[in-house]
């Protein structure tokens, strides 16, 4: 919730607070295509690594609520080697590494920093508790795919999960 989500162009596309509610988040994220990107700066990484944060489900099992993510540096480095994390000293550098337009990602980061400083999200109305500046390098971009964690309705099945209707 406290992190900036962008699409493959570097544009912020929804209120990240919705990640608390997976069905709503999934619908917003699905429109971005195959990949979604989470962007944060060194100050946020340091806070998660040393203090933890009280966000509900900040990154599933990756970062636990109210617990320091002492493994965060190692996880970022390991996933950088796999091509799922990009690290750059400037927002433009990390954008290029992630294949995004540097000006677009910079505009998204600058806008989020402005919202964090003013305590109000003028774009999507995210609660001020979750607003985080993206201004202190190095910068991190984590690439992820949408996973379906819940479903609404679907096929009718019996107690053995056998489909009841051929349609």
Give a label for each model feature:
Residues 1-97:
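An anion/pyrophosphate-binding glycine-rich loop and adjacent beta-alpha core
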Residues 104-167:
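A glycine-rich dinucleotide-binding beta-alpha-beta segment and adjacent secondary-structure elements
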């Amino acid at each position: 919730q406290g992190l900036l989500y962008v699409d493959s162009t570097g544009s912020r596309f929804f209120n990240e607070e919705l990640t608390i509610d997976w069905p709503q988040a999934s619908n917003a994220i699905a429109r971005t295509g195959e990949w979604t990107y989470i962007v944060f700066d060194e100050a946020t990484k340091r806070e998660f690594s040393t203090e933890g944060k009280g966000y509900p489900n900040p990154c599933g099992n990756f970062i636990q609520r109210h617990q320091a993510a002492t493994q965060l540096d190692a996880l970022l480095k390991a996933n950088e080697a796999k091509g799922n994390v990009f690290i750059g000293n400037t927002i433009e550098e990390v954008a290029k590494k992630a294949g995004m337009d540097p000006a677009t990602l910079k505009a998204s980061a600058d806008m989020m920093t402005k919202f964090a400083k003013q305590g109000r999200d003028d774009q999507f109305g995210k609660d001020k508790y979750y607003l985080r500046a993206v201004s202190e390098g190095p910068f991190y971009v984590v690439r992820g795919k949408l996973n379906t964690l819940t479903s609404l309705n679907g096929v009718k099945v019996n107690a053995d999960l056998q489909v009841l209707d051929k349609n």
